[in-house]
């Protein structure tokens, strides 16, 4: 993170300190990763020797970042509105056209990723992370001592969100992050070169190719025998959507060479 991140909760805390005449206060400017000391002045607040203005308008469900000249929402519009969204848990989620891409109601999106990564037992493994998103899968793979994580992310806008999110791990020797389409990128991986995989694609209506038998066959090709794959499917309503996506996913994975069992809001598949 290169500057402070401000949410409505943080901004209200700053304003309350100003009203109370408090010279200094403790708050978080990195979405709950840490706390820091801020001086609340009458016209501006000061952090690490730099003065920042109070926002004229600070909206809920919005994160503001410092551009070097002013605060702007962590959001972009390029065909769709994509934005980083604060949660009560600390680690943010993100939305595309108002649709949440990560769970937040019952559990932190970061903690949710930990549970799913545990299913593939990453320790010592080369892990394929097909749809990197904010990098929470990758973060827990690294925490779980994966030997290496190979991550793809197709959206430049998501990568931009990720660059501003203090909960997203930066690329390094253990984390390869490719800006590209994994449908094409997976073809560059040798047979049996991956020990485990995590597949968290956008919903079927947006990225049907990531649910195809052809792609699952590629996953089977790059995974070693007995390699584990967690495939997030969510729990779409078959009555309203007209299709049972989890059942379709399980059927195609079996056809591609996996043994499959339901696991929470996805399926756990083992390469035969």
Q: Where are the predicted features?
A:
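N-terminal auxiliary segments of SAM/dcSAM-dependent transferases
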Residues: 1-88
């Amino acid at each position: 993170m290169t500057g402070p991140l401000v949410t409505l909760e943080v901004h209200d805390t700053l304003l309350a300190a100003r009203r109370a005449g408090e010279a200094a206060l403790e708050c978080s400017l990195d979405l709950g990763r840490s706390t820091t000391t801020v001086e609340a002045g009458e016209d501006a607040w000061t952090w690490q020797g730099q003065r920042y203005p109070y926002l004229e308008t600070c909206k809920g469900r919005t994160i503001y970042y410092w551009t070097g000249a002013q605060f702007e929402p962590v959001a972009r519009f390029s065909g769709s509105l994509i934005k980083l969204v604060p949660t009560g848990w600390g680690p943010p989620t993100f939305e595309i056209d108002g649709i949440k891409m990560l769970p937040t109601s019952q559990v932190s999106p970061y903690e949710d990723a930990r549970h799913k990564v545990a299913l593939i037992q990453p320790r010592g493994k080369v892990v394929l992370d097909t749809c990197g998103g904010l990098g929470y899968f990758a973060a827990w793979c690294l925490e779980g001592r994966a030997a290496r994580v190979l991550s793809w992310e197709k959206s430049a806008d998501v990568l931009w969100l990720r660059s501003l999110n203090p909960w997203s791990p930066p690329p390094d020797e253990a984390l390869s992050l490719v800006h590209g389409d994994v449908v094409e990128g997976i073809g560059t991986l040798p047979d049996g070169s991956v020990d485990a995989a995590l597949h968290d694609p956008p919903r079927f209506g947006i990225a049907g190719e990531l649910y195809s038998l052809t792609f699952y066959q590629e996953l089977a090709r790059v995974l070693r025998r007995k390699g584990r794959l967690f495939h997030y499917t969510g729990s779409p309503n078959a009555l309203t959507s007209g299709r049972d996506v989890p059942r379709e996913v399980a059927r195609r994975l079996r056809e591609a060479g996996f043994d499959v069992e339901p696991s929470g809001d996805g399926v756990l598949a083992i390469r035969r």
